[in-house]
Amino acid sequence: MNSQQCVIIAIAGASASGKSLIAKTIFDELRRDLGTDQIGVINEDAYYRDQSHLSMDERVLTNYDHPKALDHQLLCTHLQLLKSGEAVDIPCYSYTEHTRTADTVTMTPKKVIILEGILLLTDPKLRELMDASVFMDTPLDICFLRRLTRDVAERGRTMESVISQYKKTVRPMFLQFIEPSKQYADIIVPRGGKNRIATDILKTRIQHLLAK
């Protein structure tokens, strides 16, 4: 598979803005046409830096909403390898341990790769690899309520810790890094991941890129 046959789509926006939902919708609908082995999803969270050398007390103090918390260079390298036809081993990140695990997930080359993550559009080198990009423009208060519910139910967090993190880093970093990166998006999606018109537009764009 050569680089011209690999379409990379990025879905960015605040935490809990609907990125995963629209990514799953696109994945489920396109795999019927392309086949499951020809489309893949990469979550930016997998590229949080390894913190196994730090104590748990130190790990919880990390600002996970700052671009420096992520190894975007490794993500760029993996995308370049996938575009050139090589498989990669994607790290696995533990939200409860706040570091990578010893496991990896192997991804083989795909016709379509969907990236999803909060800070994807902040990195110029990543943007150069994208064929199309989306920003989920969901109101921040709605994102916070969704995040609070999700992190307590699915990620072993306490309500107090989620609220504290939101005040200290999530909201400030959104305003400093994530929201300004909206200017680089090709498509801005209001009303979250259930926006059917936006989903259809993105699917059409992917199909057009594949037909080139």
Curated annotation (Swiss-Prot):
Record keyword tRNA processing present: no
InterPro entries: P-loop_NTPase, PRK/URK, Uridine_kinase, Uridine_kinase-like
Any one of the GO BP annotations: UMP salvage
GO cellular component terms, A-Z: cytoplasm
Top-level enzyme category: transferase
Catalytic activity as recorded in UniProt: uridine + ATP = UMP + ADP + H(+); cytidine + ATP = CMP + ADP + H(+)
Pathway: Pyrimidine metabolism; CTP biosynthesis via salvage pathway; CTP from cytidine: step 1/3; Pyrimidine metabolism; UMP biosynthesis via salvage pathway; UMP from uridine: step 1/1
Key words, A-Z: ATP-binding, Cytoplasm, Kinase, Nucleotide-binding, Transferase
Pfam families assigned: PRK (PF00485)
The keyword Glycoprotein is annotated on this UniProt entry: no
Compartments where found: Cytoplasm
Family indicated by similarity: Belongs to the uridine kinase family.
PANTHER family associated with the record: URIDINE KINASE
Listed name of the protein: Uridine kinase
Gene: udk
